[in-house]
Curated annotation (Swiss-Prot):
Zn(2+) binds at residues 9, 12, 31, 34. Belongs to the ClpX chaperone family. ATP-dependent specificity component of the Clp protease. It directs the protease to specific substrates. Can perform chaperone functions in the absence of ClpP. Gene3D superfamilies: 1.10.8.60, ClpX chaperone, C4-type zinc finger domain (6.20.220.10), P-loop containing nucleotide triphosphate hydrolases (3.40.50.300). The gene is clpX. It comes from Azotobacter vinelandii. Keywords: ATP-binding, Chaperone, Metal-binding, Nucleotide-binding, Zinc. This is ATP-dependent Clp protease ATP-binding subunit ClpX.
Length: 440
């Protein structure tokens, strides 16, 4: 370059001026605009490398469902919906920098599709999402909507969700931006009904409003120190590519669906419609629409951020029985492993398993009720077991009493003492009547 010429950017040729400062190097200069462009190019290279690392982990929806089948029993429709949604989401991210396909002739920007899951407590909502995140190998964060508050209230603000996701990613912003966030108990953010009038929960609606931009896609500034002050260094997390999944029990939602699809019978006498058998909750929720969620109390803008809606079915006795024994980490397998660590073999009879499933149905807490019943039945045995080195086996069985009652009892087998007999364990039994009274 001629020394008589004005200094200019070696990349774009922009001349140095009060508004265009230049950074000088050994053999040239660069302006601020070209620095930003270079940063975008280098960042794109890094993103492509991350895409290549994630690409081998992207499997087909069929493969995702097979993995979910190993951990979650039943819920076929929900598992298929989640598998397709997750596959499409990460397929979109892997091809975001790809050249336009020849059939379209232009680049089409794909919008992300967040997911809302409705279903009774204990049906596997959290387990499904956590399992998918583990299969994908992406950061995962879970937030309880009941702890979130809008600005000006005491509690966790919505930005704390991204802070947890960033922590799960080890502080790597790029990795966090490909993560999954699960917001549980979103039904608690809905309006509350009192008497004949619907009273809107101001705090809950405020949280819904605060979540809108984050769920849709925005830049969230997170302090590296975790504390908010003027001097703390910040990290910027773009939420456009974060998959948000919301879940909740939505008690009473089935009644809203029923009132929509089954109008009241106002006929009299011969004009009255014949009474039909009331549909089950699962049949009603198969007809769930966004309008029903709005009627429940979620604002339309919040519902619109979750275009994919799926329902998890209420668990019946047969499904609870399978949950006890079939999954990879089935509850019975866990307790057998726990006993095996202490050199004791645990056997649970079929009659006991059926009784445990019955009691879980009475508690109305889904799969969580199974652990509660089994823990109560084995608690005293587990208390005494470390102090009984001669103990070699335990059998949990259902005992029928003369008065018609039933209870779970543990029979223990000691080390060889010449008789090899099985004797009752001095453990309190779990009686059917006590479980019923507790539920009432």
């Amino acid at each position: 370059m001629d020394k008589t010429d004005k200094p200019c950017c070696s990349f774009c040729g922009a001349e140095k001026s009060p508004t265009v400062p230049l950074i000088a190097g050994n053999d040239g200069r660069i302006c601020e605009a070209c620095v930003k462009l270079a940063h975008q190019v280098v960042s794109s290279w890094g993103q492509r490398r991350k895409n290549q690392q994630l690409a081998p982990q992207l499997r087909t929806p069929v493969e995702y469902k097979k993995h979910l089948d190993e951990s979650v029993i039943g819920q076929e429709a929900a598992k298929e919906t989640l598998s397709v949604a997750v596959y499409n989401h990460y397929l979109r991210l892997l091809n975001c920098d790809r050249e336009p396909v020849c059939q379209l002739g232009e680049q089409v920007e794909l919008e992300k599709s967040n997911i809302l899951m409705a279903g009774p407590s204990g049906t596997g909502k959290t387990l499904l999402v956590r399992t998918l995140a583990r299969i994908l190998g992406v950061p995962f964060a879970m937030a309880d909507a009941t702890t979130l508050t809008q600005a000006g209230y005491v509690g966790d603000d919505v930005d704390s969700i991204i802070t947890r996701l960033l922590d799960a990613a080890g502080g790597d912003v790029q990795q966090a931006q490909w993560g999954i966030v699960y917001i549980d108990e979103v039904d608690k953010l809905a309006k509350r009904s009192g008497g004949g009038t619907a009273v809107r929960d101001i705090s809950g609606e405020g949280v819904q409003q605060a979540l809108l931009k984050m769920v849709e896609g925005t830049e969230v500034r997170i302090s590296k120190s975790g504390r908010r002050n003027e001097h703390s260094e910040e990290q910027v997390v773009d939420t456009r590519n974060i998959l948000f999944i919301a879940g909740g029990a939505f008690p009473g939602l089935e009644a809203l669906v029923s009132s929509r699809i089954q109008p009241k019978n106002t006929g009299i006498g011969f004009h009255a419609q014949p009474r039909r058998e009331a549909p089950s909750i699962n049949e009603l929720m198969a007809s769930l629409l966004p309008d029903d969620l709005h009627e429940f109390g979620l604002i339309p803008e919040f519902i619109g951020r979750f275009p994919i809606i799926t329902f998890l079915q209420e668990l019946d006795h047969a499904t609870l029985l399978r949950i006890l024994t079939e999954p990879r980490n089935a509850l019975v397998k866990q307790y057998k492993q726990l006993f095996a660590y202490q050199g004791v073999e645990l056997v649970i009879t079929d009659a006991a398993l059926n009784y445990i499933a019955d009691q879980a149905l009475i508690r109305k807490t889904g799969a969580r009720g199974l652990r509660a019943v089994l823990e109560a039945a084995l608690q005293q045995t587990m208390f005494n077991m470390p102090s009984q080195p001669q103990l070699r086996g335990c059998t949990l069985d259902l005992v029928e009493h003369e008065d018609g009652g039933r209870s779970l009892e543990v029979l223990t087998r000691l080390a060889e003492d010449g008789s090899g007999r099985i004797q009752p364990d001095p453990s309190p039994v779990v009686e059917e009547k006590s479980a019923l009274s507790a539920d009432l």
